From Swiss-Prot:
HAMAP family: TruB_bact. NCBIfam families: TruB. Its EC number is 5.4.99.25. Pfam families: TruB_N (PF01509). Belongs to the pseudouridine synthase TruB family. Type 1 subfamily. Responsible for synthesis of pseudouridine from uracil-55 in the psi GC loop of transfer RNAs. One of its GO terms (biological process) is tRNA pseudouridine synthesis. This is tRNA pseudouridine synthase B. It comes from Campylobacter jejuni subsp. jejuni serotype O:6 (strain 81116 / NCTC 11828). The active site is at residue 38. The keyword Isomerase applies.
Amino acid sequence: MNKIFAAFKPRGLSSNAFLSTLKKKYKNKKAGYSGTLDPFAKGVLIVAFGQYTKLFRFLKKTPKTYKATLWLGVYSLSLDDQNIKEIKNIKEFDLANLQQIIDQMQGIISYTPPQFSAKRINGTRAYELAKKGIEANLKPCQMEVFDCKILSYNHPFLNIEITVSEGAYIRSYCELFARKLGINATLSSLERIKEGKFVYNNEKSLNVLKYINLKPNFIKDLNKLENGAKIFVEELKFHDEGDYYIETEKYFSIINIKENTVKYLLNKVEKC
C-alpha cells in the first residue's frame, strides 16, 4: 500500500513509538516519517507507507508552524515542563516589551540545540543520553524565523505562533527569548500545526505529486517509463538540469538531468 498523510503525534510518545502504532493500525510494516518530533511535542508528523517512504527527500517540508507556550521565570534542564529545577515569581512584563523582542528575533538566528532534543549523536538521540546524565557535544546551528506573533499573554504564560525553517528548535528560541528578558523560561506546551503544506486532516491520504518539490516533465513515449527504458534528454519537453517527475495514468517516475544525461532516481512508483 502506497500512502502519504499527515498524522497527529500525541504528547508523551517518541516519533518512532508513534509510527509503530500506525504500522499496526494500517497493517503495513514498510513505513517511515519525516520531521522528528520530540516526545514532549505533539502535532503534525508526515508519514508514508510503501514506496512513498522513498519520497521524503523530495517533499517540500518548510516552512514549519508551531504553537508554543512559554512559561516565564522557570528553569528546566530540558527546556520543557520536565526536569524543572527552579520556579521564580517574576514581575509581569509589558506586552509592548515582549512584542519588541519578538520583532528583534526575526530572520537568521544562531543557537545550540538543547541536550533534550531528537538530534542524533553517533546514532543515539541526544535526549536518550541526557536522561542518563551524559552531555552530548551538540554543534551550533542556525534557524530562520519567518514570522512570530503573540496569541495571548496571561502571566507567567506567553502563547505564541511561530513559523520557522527546517531544523529549527522552538525550545532554543524560547531560551534565547528569555535571555533577552534577563530571565529563565521554559516551554509548557509545543504543537506543530503545519509542515510545509501538510496539515492534519484525519490521516487523509494525499496526492503526493501536489506535495513534492519538483517540476513536471513530459515525454511522448510513455511506454519508456512503463518499461524503465533509457530516456534521452532530447525526448523530454524540458532539458534544463535538475530533478523532475513524469507521470502516467497509474505511475510516476522521478528523473534527474545532468550534463545532457537522464537518470532515474525512482521509477514506476504506483499512484495511490
